[in-house]
Amino acid sequence: MVKVKICGLRRKEDIEYANELKPDYVGFVFAKSKRQIEVEQALDLISLLDKEIKTVGVFVNEPVENALKIAQTLNLDVLQFHGDETQDYIDNFKNFTVWKAIRIKDKEDLEKTKQFKVNSFVFDTLTKNEYGGTGKTFNWKVLKGMELNVPIILAGGLNENNVEEAIKIVDPYAVDVSSGVETEGYKDFKKLKSFIEKVRGIR
């Protein structure tokens, strides 16, 4: 079954939604964005989170020392690097599960995967000057038939109306959603429920 990651949690209500709906992963964004969260705030929220749900820290070009400190303070399960990080940068996090985001415009962008040795790749939409959470999709067909020796996580503009089609085309390990389950900038329980039900209903 395809796994689900809900990204950009920042309120107690978001944690309550997650505890009820049981996504496989939840993401906390530590990069500058409208979903950015402070470490102390994340610590409080994680203390309320069902222990079965894995935690992902999302970073964009964060200094190594800062990212390590946050990861250790919060005991994060996964570190997701969503910026211009290099393999040399990623080598500082050998004790962690690491996902590297690759921003896709066309098939040529897939060549970037050859630069990295990571646990998974997150494929997201390439949008100028933005790093994720844009609500924009890319042409999923560029991923069709692609063979990688690590799992694929599909992101970029997913919502309850297109996630089934996306999964059929890409067959990812997991799908990653943020803006697609929000209303007016906040996580929406009904959209979350519908999204997760659609993913888990696929056979």
From Swiss-Prot:
Class of this enzyme: isomerase
Catalyzed reactions per annotation: N-(5-phospho-beta-D-ribosyl)anthranilate = 1-(2-carboxyphenylamino)-1-deoxy-D-ribulose 5-phosphate
Source organism, top-level taxon: Bacteria
Isomerase is among the record's keywords: yes
Pathway entry: Amino-acid biosynthesis; L-tryptophan biosynthesis; L-tryptophan from chorismate: step 3/5
Any Pfam family matching the protein: PRAI
Keyword terms: Amino-acid biosynthesis, Aromatic amino acid biosynthesis, Isomerase, Tryptophan biosynthesis
UniProt-listed GO biological process terms: L-tryptophan biosynthetic process
EC numbers for this chain: 5.3.1.24
Database matches in InterPro entries: Aldolase_TIM, PRAI_dom, RibuloseP-bd_barrel, TrpF_fam
One of the record's GO molecular function terms: phosphoribosylanthranilate isomerase activity
Cited PANTHER family: N-(5'-PHOSPHORIBOSYL)ANTHRANILATE ISOMERASE (PTHR42894:SF1)
Family of this protein: Belongs to the TrpF family.
Name this polypeptide is given: N-(5'-phosphoribosyl)anthranilate isomerase
Taxonomic placement: Bacteria, Bacillati, Bacillota, Clostridia, Thermoanaerobacterales
Gene that specifies this protein: trpF
